[in-house]
């Protein structure tokens, strides 16, 4: 009743957006599910909020990261096995971010089975910047994961996350406070690898999820998939990737530095035999048509 807001499990980047708005003389209007006397915790202070409107029904939230394992194809399983053995294991990838598609869901489900067979437990996939994917549960329950910092929540995962405060960032109130701003920062500077599916790749290795008949959201991929130069803490995987960088001497001279490993998963042909590898990305024509 004092205007303080509890955004809870799916806090994401709301406090950062509200703060930026309020401290630039903007107006903040909050639509809330319920007005109460006391909150479990304060995610946004009341003096940053100008108006509060109680909604007649809870705001609709759609599950974004839940993938039905029955829909994972044999090709996606094969790609996952290739990635685990040939990339994760080869480089010793411990800190990473996964995309949200079926390709990485397959990898997550393969960790406690195929990954265990390869003897990689404790050597890879210990620390994630990741939303609470249900497909991570087997790996968490079998002791693969040390920590997961989340951009946001996932419908239906709040109770599981609260029960695993040893893995997720859970507060004294018993619920997680996701933080997209912190996750993007950590994903930009601190992880060894980003891996995710894509729709088109050109001869230069440029990748795009925008095609002539489909523009898919890319989330944090451009951020996670870049190679930041301001890394503060080195790792074996980061240094190994840097050693293999073909133009490192021309770029860096004698400096011994690493490089972000970026992996894009694609099939030679997609649905209706649309090619995954193309001479020119559809994104160029889309950008031209949109006057971008």
Which role fits each region the language model picked out?
Residues 1-98, 102-126, 130, 134-292:
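Conserved phosphate- and dinucleotide-binding cores of soluble alpha/beta proteins
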């Amino acid at each position: 009743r004092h205007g303080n807001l509890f955004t809870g499990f799916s806090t994401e980047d709301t406090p950062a957006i509200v703060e930026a708005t309020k401290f630039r003389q903007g107006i903040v209007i909050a639509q809330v599910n319920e007005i109460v006397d006391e909150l479990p915790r304060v995610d946004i202070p009341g003096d940053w909020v100008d108006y509060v409107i109680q909604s007649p029904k809870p705001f609709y939230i759609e599950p974004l990261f839940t993938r039905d394992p029955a829909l994972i194809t044999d090709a996606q399983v094969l790609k996952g096995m290739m990635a685990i053995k040939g990339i994760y294991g080869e480089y010793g990838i411990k800190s990473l971010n996964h995309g949200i598609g079926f390709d990485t869901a397959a990898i997550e489900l393969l960790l406690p089975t195929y990954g265990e067979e390869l003897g990689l437990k404790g050597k890879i996939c210990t620390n994630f910047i990741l939303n609470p994917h249900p497909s991570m549960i087997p790996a968490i329950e079998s002791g693969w994961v040390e920590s997961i910092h989340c951009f946001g929540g996932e419908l239906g995962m709040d109770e599981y996350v609260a029960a695993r405060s040893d893995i997720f960032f859970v507060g004294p109130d018993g619920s997680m406070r996701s933080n997209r701003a912190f996750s993007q920062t950590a994903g930009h500077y601190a992880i060894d690898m980003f891996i995710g599916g894509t729709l088109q790749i050109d001869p230069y290795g440029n990748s795009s999820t925008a095609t002539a008949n489909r523009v898919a959201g890319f989330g944090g991929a451009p951020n996670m998939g870049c190679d930041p130069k301001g890394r503060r803490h080195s790792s074996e995987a980061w240094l190994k990737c840097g050693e293999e960088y073909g133009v490192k001497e021309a770029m860096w001279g004698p400096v011994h530095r690493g490089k972000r490993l970026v992996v894009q998963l694609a099939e030679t042909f997609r649905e209706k035999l649309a090619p995954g590898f193309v001479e020119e990305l559809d994104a160029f024509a889309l950008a031209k048509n949109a006057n971008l």
